[in-house]
């Protein structure tokens, strides 16, 4: 072991051989617990913020687990408001991409590229929906030849939308199609490297350098051709398709994703080619956000200004896909990051355009208004890795008549607002809250709402409504009522909602001693108003910035609040409360919730959500809340799916098969299933799925357990049942629940 202190400031720090650089004029405060590594090359998994102070971060060697404290890296223009990151302009055909231009919207065709007419028709439908750019898969020479005809036909029909070739394992195909398409997407994990076998390989320094020389030899001709023809390029890393070489040194990590892309970017820069963008995609929004932030932090260090293409890969379909995409893309847009976006849905590609546009509009508005809060010092947020700030869950107090320990859930809570009308039919209310009914009595289940808010309490003589609430309280469901209601129509054992004014004015002291408090606040209040939180006992905080607020950013106000709480060791759980206006579109609601609440939960900031919308279906709001928690890798209440959006490589009707599998397996919380049209990027694309259903050849399916294929060539008509059999084989199956009578 070694500890020590280096002089500060230290200029131009660079950790030897790790490819992790740090900018000039930064202070290296101290180095501790540095162990000698087996290799000359330091293995690095992730940069992590330290709790030691605002100017520190931890650099974690992958195998030894010893923190190296280094200066905290900048990853966005501002920590207290949305300011769009300045980038160079990259030309993709006739479309300019970068910070001086609108956030560009794009998608990808699903037709067989060799079907020229079908592909042309699909591109036109996409363009008519408003996309700026379209990507087409090009897997071989026949597809590359077809691309020339596709481009010609579109031009003849006055469709000049830029076309992007999606390339995997095919450098020669990339060279061919660069002569007609406007942009080439290369995957650093498989452009020059073989498909990952998930083997840990020990390289000497010379062996590693030879691998890099091989990449340069294979990649250079494409760079030179793109320069010659004025083509753009996307260096697009996928978390699931990192090479064995990268994973051996950096782990299956955001750090490895960044280094994989930088290897290719260094070659581009060496050849004086700069018309390229980066992407860091993953199916897990938490990993995706970390990777993009780390990428940008490294670009700041090097003085690079290349634009970003944002996307969550294999997001799925319907609300799930929109939610995952909003959590990942929306979070980064609030940080001012992102110049073009794609929402990857297992739906027709033109259906991706509307949610794409909604996300782009959110990001554009936030940056234009520079939504935020007054500057504040941020010391405690972990934005290069996930470390959840866990609020103290309620504990039972002496003399309490009911059990409050389950009014919040340790993995993330869902709160709902209910009306007096709903109390008129108690059994329907119990079902709406997803309780399990036994002889008409409610009991909490896996996906039951944890607590409810009533803005108006029933009259004291309304025995039906009050009995319904008592039964909910008796099974540890929290019932929250405003202070004024509880003082005039007291409900035994209710929790009481108070604001900061009611706290500072002492009105809450009119309540019986021991009453549980729920505090509602915005997060941008003067610190002297927040000071009262240090002197009270609250069961939870509801963080609520009005939806119509234009100048204050919900995300930045919450970050400021969490900073105050952490700095003062106030550990109340915080629930993100969003009250949507009447008439909001469902997709808009999902995307806002994913952006504004998900953007905090992926940083480990928050203990649950409460979504309100006066004219939206109650079940929809409840399901959306649970989907949000699951999308942020918090509380699992249903089967998790990793489902690719389909492309020209897909070997079956992905939408139809996906629906069939979901119908039969959606009741398996804690189980994750990958549904992949092909395995072009290798089994790593299935992320951390427990089981995989993958197109192996036309009409045939391969089944996976983890990243290992266990059954090959199953007829498609039998494959879904075979998947269920595999789940049963591994002890992960339960029969679907029987509906309550």
Curated annotation (Swiss-Prot):
Gene Ontology BP annotations: isopentenyl diphosphate biosynthetic process, methylerythritol 4-phosphate pathway; response to bacterium; systemic acquired resistance, salicylic acid mediated signaling pathway; terpenoid biosynthetic process
Q: Which domain of life is it from?
A: Eukaryota
On assembly, the entry states: Homodimer.
Listed pathway(s) = Isoprenoid biosynthesis; isopentenyl diphosphate biosynthesis via DXP pathway; isopentenyl diphosphate from 1-deoxy-D-xylulose 5-phosphate: step 5/6
Q: Which residues are the transit peptide here? A: 1-38
Question: Which gene is annotated as encoding this protein in its UniProt record?
Answer: ISPG
**What does the record give as the reaction this protein catalyses?**
(2E)-4-hydroxy-3-methylbut-2-enyl diphosphate + 2 oxidized [2Fe-2S]-[ferredoxin] + H2O = 2-C-methyl-D-erythritol 2,4-cyclic diphosphate + 2 reduced [2Fe-2S]-[ferredoxin] + H(+)
| Tissue specificity annotation | Expressed in roots, shoots, leaves, flowers and siliques (at protein level).
Induction pattern: Circadian-regulated with a peak in the late period of dark phase and early period of the light phase.
A Pfam family (short name) is GcpE
Which InterPro entries does the UniProt entry name for this protein?
Answer: Dihydropteroate_synth-like_sf (IPR011005), IspG_atypical (IPR017178), IspG_bac-typ (IPR004588), NO2/SO3_Rdtase_4Fe4S_sf (IPR045854)
Recite the UniProt cofactor note for this protein.
Binds 1 [4Fe-4S] cluster per subunit.
- Which residues are involved in binding [4Fe-4S] cluster? 644, 647, 678, 685
Required co-factors: [4Fe-4S] cluster
Keyword list, A-Z: 4Fe-4S, Chloroplast, Iron, Iron-sulfur, Isoprene biosynthesis, Metal-binding, Oxidoreductase, Plastid, Transit peptide
Compartment(s) = Plastid, Chloroplast stroma
Q: Please give the GO cellular component terms listed in this UniProt entry.
A: chloroplast; chloroplast envelope; chloroplast stroma; plastid
State the family named in the UniProt similarity comment for this chain.
Belongs to the IspG family.
The protein in question is named 4-hydroxy-3-methylbut-2-en-1-yl diphosphate synthase (ferredoxin), chloroplastic
Q: What happens when the gene is disrupted?
A: Albino phenotype and seedling lethal when homozygous. The phenotype is caused by an early arrest in chloroplast differentiation.
